[in-house]
Swiss-Prot record:
One of its GO terms (biological process) is diaminopimelate biosynthetic process. PANTHER family: 4-HYDROXY-TETRAHYDRODIPICOLINATE REDUCTASE (PTHR20836:SF7), DIHYDRODIPICOLINATE REDUCTASE (PTHR20836). GO terms for molecular function: 4-hydroxy-tetrahydrodipicolinate reductase; NAD binding; NADP binding; oxidoreductase activity, acting on CH or CH2 groups, NAD or NADP as acceptor. NCBIfam families: dapB (TIGR00036). Pfam families: DapB_C (PF05173), DapB_N (PF01113). The keyword Cytoplasm applies. GO terms for cellular component: cytosol. Its EC number is 1.17.1.8. NAD(+) binds at A79, T80, T81, S103, A104, N105, M106. It catalyses: (S)-2,3,4,5-tetrahydrodipicolinate + NAD(+) + H2O = (2S,4S)-4-hydroxy-2,3,4,5-tetrahydrodipicolinate + NADH + H(+); (S)-2,3,4,5-tetrahydrodipicolinate + NADP(+) + H2O = (2S,4S)-4-hydroxy-2,3,4,5-tetrahydrodipicolinate + NADPH + H(+). This is 4-hydroxy-tetrahydrodipicolinate reductase.
Amino acid sequence: MKILLIGYGAMNQRVARLAEEKNHEIVGVIVRNSEKHYPYPTFEHISEATEADVAIDFSNPELLLPLLEEDFNLPVVIATTGEKEQIIDKLKALSTDMPVFFSANMSYGVHALTKILEAAVPLLQDFDIELTEAHHNKKVDAPSGTLVKLYDVIESLRETTTPVYDRHETTEKRTQDEIGIHSIRGGTIVGEHDVLFAGTDETIEITHRAQSKDIFANGAISAAEKLVQNKNGYYTFDNL
């Protein structure tokens, strides 16, 4: 498989290393600063990478969104999480002409976490829910795209929900429709996501901890391997 990388930060550097270990080939990268030295050819547009079988994106909305507006026909695996709604809308429009894949988190374990949550929420309607995520001190967005995805699952299964991001000025007791959302940034934490169900005299906690960023890179490569075998359409972990 010949892969075009969109972005060449820490994540796509891992994708490159792991993909080559699996005997895939990196044909080039799309980056904002093409004057910097890279170990692969640099491109400005997806359509320029004529040898590529698939593109894997770990970048940012500023780089990605303009590329998605261009004329190209190449399967794409997208992991950028900022401006999620815009990205998904554009991918769904592109999906009539090519297979596209999107996930806010490329870990299959996190996908499993959402499925566990889908089963737990209906069983625990009387429990309060608090969501917490923790990441390294270089992560710029908060809350994480994964935590937003977990909230979306809860919102779809409860009659009313209200996300609460800050309680330091609150002087009233918690309401049952509140979903507390908390972000921690520090050190080199790869990624932790925790769902706390708090009931009367008991709590249930569901946690996913990433122990290496390789799980995200391998998840993207695995998605790409499957995507190139599929017909045009919009894919997630649910249907790939």
